[in-house]
Amino acid sequence: MSDNITDLEPTAERPNVRKVFVKTYGCQMNVYDSQRMADSLAAEGYVATDTPDDADLVLLNTCHIREKASEKLYSALGRLRKMKDAREANGKELTIGVAGCVAQAEGQEILRRAPNVDLVIGPQTYHRLPNALARVRSGEKVVETEYALEDKFEHLPSPKREETRKRGVSAFLTVQEGCDKFCTFCVVPYTRGSEVSRSVKQIVAEAERLADSGVRELTLLGQNVNAWHGAGDDGREWGLGELLFRLARIPGIARLRYTTSHPRDMDDSLIAAHRDLRQLMPYLHLPVQSGSDRILKAMNRRHKADEYVRLIERIREVRPDLALSGDFIVGFPGETDQDFEDTMRLVRDVNYAQAYSFKYSPRPGTPGADLDDHVEEAVKDERLQRLQALLSEQQYAFQDSMIGREMDVLLEKPGRVAGQMVGRSPWLLPVIIDDSNDRVGDIIHVKITSTGTNSLIAQKLA
């Protein structure tokens, strides 16, 4: 557990300061949440460190989507228990906190299974983190998972400009949380709550602050991001499409993305944004989970497979260069060979640039956990292997199709060798450019010459 994967840069050494190590598991929103928790702690005098070995506070921001994520948490807590015992033997302290969706789902159970934990705090209450830590210092074991009545975003401090600059030229911005879809396999409605949209005023203010700190690309986040809605500047009710047009007017913001979407919430205004908004990148993550109508109904997805395919056709009609990403679950209870073949057919019909696929694992508290007719693990394994082979074939074909193409690339960081830069293509793929004297944050025109492992190799054009 030596990696800090939250994009929190360690701060220069200062004597007698409290240090925090944040470990993030799971989705992009957890990365965003970790950054905001770090901002709260910075306001209390904590500085980030890139190792738990010298941290005064270790905070694990957790994911509950799959069973393995919970197992990772308890394995990490076992290692931290030994570290905490060693500290106490030398008269020193280590505070251990668990945040995120496992914290929300399990609460007091975490303290029972891991008594070395001092603090459990959910994703809707992390604005109370400084107060919770004060209670821990007074000797209390704290579980803070009740859904807050107040808007947490109104109570979170903004990071200092130099801290935002250290995080890079691409940034996440949460605009929506929670989900009301209640897919039978999913824990999100139970760990993140009902759908809540942040106000246009809040979102624009945060986006302007990020742009002022040098951010060029914004990715809007939500568990069901295209369900976002709110009162617009013009007095009308806006959807995500209108919000994207508003954010595109902010000076300095050159690129926009959003994730994760639900097919039922892809409305006309959002499709129009893909057609008309040059800042909106031609990349869409739109999960379908299965190509079988019978399984989609059992999952409570509220759409059919052919409706999903027709939706993709509509978007590609207005944005022919769109690259599509998706999510798939194999082995959902009752999935037959024919159901799986329907999924394979949908994948062939849609042709994905990238996709994520998993074996179904029942999550406690979800309707899917109570279903009978579970698929044997060996069958799940075989289906997953076949699906991933097809998706990999499509992914490599998409990357190969980039060879010879010209495109604009946003430079994000120096490469591993002198003179090399790493950027991001409009289709989200990393692009490696040799012999570049450009700066991070520049957008340069390149020609793709070859492909690497999940990356593109390019030559800068004059």
Swiss-Prot record:
Cofactor detail note: Binds 2 [4Fe-4S] clusters. One cluster is coordinated with 3 cysteines and an exchangeable S-adenosyl-L-methionine.
Enzyme class: transferase
Pfam family, any one: UPF0004
Record's keyword terms, sorted: 4Fe-4S, Cytoplasm, Iron, Iron-sulfur, Metal-binding, S-adenosyl-L-methionine, Transferase, tRNA processing
GO cellular component, one term: cytosol
Binding site for [4Fe-4S] cluster 2: C179, C183, C186
Domain Radical SAM core: 165-397
EC id: 2.8.4.3
Subunit field text: Monomer.
UniProt name for this protein: tRNA-2-methylthio-N(6)-dimethylallyladenosine synthase
Protein species of origin: Brucella anthropi (strain ATCC 49188 / DSM 6882 / CCUG 24695 / JCM 21032 / LMG 3331 / NBRC 15819 / NCTC 12168 / Alc 37) (Ochrobactrum anthropi)
Highest classification ranks of the organism: Bacteria, Pseudomonadati, Pseudomonadota, Alphaproteobacteria, Hyphomicrobiales
